[in-house]
A protein has these predicted regions:
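Conserved nucleotide-binding/hydrolysis micro-motifs of P-loop NTPases
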Residues: 60-63, 99-101, 134-137, 158-161, ...
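Conserved C-terminal guanine-recognition region of P-loop GTPase G domains, centered on the G4
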Residues: 42, 68-87, 117-124, 132-151, ...
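Short alpha-helix plus adjacent loop in nuclease-associated cores
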Residues: 157-179
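C-terminal-of-GTPase-core extension/linker across diverse P-loop GTPases
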Residues: 14-54, 186-262, 266-269, 273, ...
Length: 478
């Protein structure tokens, strides 16, 4: 007999135990896949039937943990927006709660815990609770679920739900799966402890070679992580090849970053005139890092890199899972940071983006020269507390094309400085080989006849040092 079963009340399906510690070879991958999917489903409480949620926005009243660039009410509004982004999810009730810290075993004090427990029990519409903090500790999560008797979510879990919903391409799905790994790993020990408490023992050997429940789960997660890394490495290699081709062709790249739903895709659509881009008014609408061709006022071709949006109060590991594609943005020549000028929590959102870029080790010079574009100026402004925006912010409306010329001029100036290009006027014979070479190799923004000699033209071009050297060797230093 190849295996026996040990039923743990934490899982609906039995945990299979093998006499030699390993399943039959032909069943190994299938078994690991099924167990991994079961682990993900239970850890993140995945369901196709939707949810009805009580949202609790905790905040620290004073001390070092107090947030000073936002308010609990604005944080709660974002928590509501996160839930409303998910299909079939509804907010049943919501509240803010002041706490001394987020470190208690039960997260809340006795009074607040009882109040919340009673609220959940008395309202049958509440079938889950969302505690809007970046990540609950395993012990806190287990305690709260035992107290409330319903699934409990933190921000990491909710963002993963949204990522799963919005991931459509293979690249995005692989990176979402990679983003799940750190959370799964942090929960495995708690996953075991919860089961062991129910079967009343301190250890559970489920493999013939002495493997415990947690050993098997770690191995399953490790196998999936290894597989994901291999697939993502292929993506990274392909993107490196594309980047090297762009470098060879001397294309300048402009990364467009920002808080989720700040209007990054809308701005790229406005800057490039690409009607095929379809921005969506929702959080994390873009999970794929995509590249779009555009032209600066000098007719220099640039590539705009659209990126996944950032958000506050989630671990950096969640965003780092998208490194395979984020590298396109991190290695750009210029960064444009898009802010939502109409958002009441504008200051906090801008600070979140800058802090996230620092944690992702973006080049210091790139950060210092980052262009800030204040989008959505066509909407009513609701400036929040302690506004601290860059004095040289360029205000635009991607929807109405307001301020785009000023923004394009700033982008052009930064691109020229970052790539060593210069704008200059070159006098060449009209219709000659020099003129043809310049049209083919560099950006030409203007051509006028030479007023002193009609056989010549004056060409305003944007040219790199290398291109200028080649031009001189071909046509001047002969």
């Amino acid at each position: 007999m190849w295996f026996q079963t040990l039923n743990l009340t934490l899982t609906k399906s039995p945990v299979r135990c093998f006499a030699n510690g390993n399943p039959p070879r032909e069943d190994n991958e299938e078994y690991a896949e099924a167990e991994y999917e079961d682990l993900v489903k239970r850890t993140f409480h995945l369901s196709d039937s939707g949810n009805q949620v009580l949202i609790v926005q905790p905040y620290v009243k004073w001390g070092s943990g107090k947030k000073r660039n936002t308010t609990p009410e604005l944080q709660l509004a974002e928590a509501v927006a996160l839930i409303e982004t998910l299909p079939k999810w509804k907010v049943v009730d919501k509240l803010v709660l002041p706490l001394q810290s987020f470190h208690k075993k039960t997260f809340f004090g006795k009074g607040n815990l009882k109040m919340l427990r009673d609220k959940v029990r008395e309202n049958e519409k509440i079938v889950s609770v969302f505690i809007s903090v970046n990540e609950l500790r395993g012990t806190q999560h287990r305690e709260l679920e035992e107290q409330f008797g319903v699934p409990v979510f933190d921000r990491y879990m909710i963002v993963i739900q949204i990522f799963r919903e919005h991931a459509t391409t293979m690249e995005a799905k692989l990176q979402v799966a990679r983003a799940e790994i750190p959370y799964l790993r942090s929960r495995i020990r708690d996953y075991q402890e919860g089961a062991l408490e129910r079967i009343g023992t301190s250890t559970a050997v489920i493999g013939g070679d002495g493997e415990t429940f947690v050993d098997v789960r770690r191995k399953i997660v490790g196998l999936r992580e290894k597989k994901l890394k291999q697939e993502l490495e292929k993506i990274r290699s392909n993107r490196e090849l594309l980047r090297s081709n762009r470098t060879r062709l001397q294309y300048a790249t402009v990364a467009v970053v920002g808080y989720t739903n700040a209007g990054k895709t809308s701005l790229i659509k406005a800057l490039t005139g690409k009607t095929t881009l379809q921005p969506k008014d929702q959080l994390f609408a873009t999970l794929d890092v995509t590249v779009h061709e555009g032209y600066l006022p000098s007719q220099l071709k640039v590539l705009y890199v659209d990126t996944v949006g950032f958000i506050s109060d989630i671990p950096t590991e969640l965003i780092e899972a998208f490194n395979a594609t984020l590298e396109d943005a991190l290695l750009a020549d210029v960064i444009v940071h898009v802010c939502d000028m109409s958002h009441p929590d504008l200051s906090a959102q801008c600070e979140t983006v800058t802090a996230t870029l620092r944690r992702l080790d973006v080049n210091k010079n790139l950060l210092e020269n980052m262009i800030v574009a204040g989008n959505k100026i066509d909407l009513p402004h609701q400036l929040g507390p302690d506004m601290n925006l860059p004095p040289d912010i360029t205000r635009v409306s991607a929807l109405h094309n307001t301020g785009l010329n000023a923004l394009l001029s700033r982008i052009e100036k930064s691109v020229l400085a970052a790539t060593g290009r210069v704008s200059m006027v070159v006098r060449v014979p009209a219709g000659g080989s020099e003129m043809a070479w310049l049209y083919k190799e560099v950006a030409v923004s203007e051509v006028i006849s030479d007023s002193e000699d009609s056989q010549y033209v004056l060409m305003r071009v944007v040219i790199s040092e290398g291109q200028l050297g080649r031009f001189k060797r071909l046509f001047i230093d002969q």
